[in-house]
Amino acid sequence: MKAGPAISIGQHSEAGRKERNDDSYGVVVPDAALLEAKGIAMAIADGMSSSEAAKIASETCVKTFLEDYYATHPSWTVKTSVGRVLSAINRWLHGQGAANHLSDRGMVTTFSGLVLKSATAYIFHAGDSRIYLLRSGAIEQLTRDHRVRISREREYLSRAVGIDTN
């Protein structure tokens, strides 16, 4: 059996400018059968700190993504599997935010996910959590922040999970 590439996984989280850290992250390296069928899945999410449910939103997003991705049909592509899982998570978070009247921010979180399957890296991203590649001592940002600048002092997220029904 041919050996695959050597992969090292690292995760880092910090609160940043806010006191509270609403980040959640995780990785699943499954057994051999699932590894071949679905690959390795990783995710990081950062709940919108202006929401009282920020940490719940990020934890739910990461946990559900990692569990539900591996429960999708084996014949589905990575894109189909992740698309359906993230769509369901988005609808659920949006619905929970609306049903529970969680201020004006709802249950909203950024999300960056990566699936490594065979020799391909699939990236799924909404918001400003980032995925980087570190190779041969050089670091490269693989995602682009979804932020809109209003002025020098003000900007906002233009995309996030749970922010709307799409």
What are these regions (language model features)?
Residues M1-N166:
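PP2C/PPM-type serine/threonine phosphatase catalytic domain
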